[in-house]
Amino acid sequence: SKMTLYRVATNSKIVEALIEAAENGKDVVVLVELRARFDEENNIEWSRRLEEAGCRIIYGLDNLKVHSKLCLITRKIGNAISYITQVGTGNYNEKTAEIYTDYSLMTARSEIGMEASRVFNALCMGQTIKHTEYLLVSPHCLQNHVADLIDREMEKAKAGQPAYIALKVNSLTDKYLIDKLIAASQAGVKIDMIVRGICCLIAGIPKKTENITVRSIVGRYLEHTRIYIFGAGNDAAVYIASADWMTRNTIRRVEVGAPIYDNDIKARILSMFRTMMQDNVKARIQQPDGSYKKQSASSSPLNAQEYFYAQAYAA
């Protein structure tokens, strides 16, 4: 089992499970990021406990924070190797999980597992992966892949085909990607963005960003999911990731995003994004002057967080 840890709870059941796995004779490799702000002391203490239990510990990289949420379980039965890969948008932390909204994908697809294995092999050598086919992995294989996906939508728009980009992040400050989004808007791509915090793009500017909408949802739970959607309809390319679209995430950190191949999961994410776009209680819509406006009271109010909460409890 291999895992990256950024922020963990003070009494972490995740770390206890890793310790138990190592004590049961499993081969456990844990990358602990010691520079997680305000959690340095906690992470040092857990590293010591993990090492004592027989886990192999890697202490991040010299010049890059490892912010990814990646776990890989490798099983060898005879000569056959199988993988279970988990990629998430949120930390392995029970305390923050109570109040943050996040997505987590678990997949047995071998191509994802093999690529995740390459990511860990590079990290174990103090390096970063330079090429990926499936996963989005910064600092080398996230920004450029995202730019290619934006270009693909621009080509569709220019050919008169439906073109769409949807994005949900905590912050948008990466100038290169902002410029790509502006170019896509000018090419006729419809773009919807849910950006909770800092957003350095102003939507609704004629001839620049008139095809872009930006809204921020601030509710009872901290919006923390990162979703990238490229394409209109069910054939859209959908990713979940640990990375915001900030230069610190795309260039100065190790982040991982995963494609969603399962049609049911993809449909669920698309549906949830549409619901968030319809939120008229906690969503504030960015105006062309950069201000955010709450929507006027509706006869049918929709609070997306409450809606998802009710759905989860009805399941």
Regions found by a protein language model. Give the residues of each.
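A short acidic, amphipathic alpha-helical/loop segment
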Residues: 13-20, 177-181
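Short hydrophobic/aromatic-rich motifs at helix boundaries and adjacent loops
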Residues: 17-20, 119-123, 150-154, 242
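Mobile "lid/hinge" segments at catalytic clefts and subdomain interfaces of large enzymes
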Residues: 92-125, 269
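PLD/PLD-like phosphodiesterase catalytic module centered on the HKD motif
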Residues: 24-84, 88-91, 96, 111-113, ...
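Active-site-adjacent structural elements in folded domains
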Residues: 8-16, 168
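Gly-rich Lys/Arg/Thr-decorated short loops/hinges at beta-loop-alpha junctions or inter-strand turns
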Residues: 126-135, 160-162
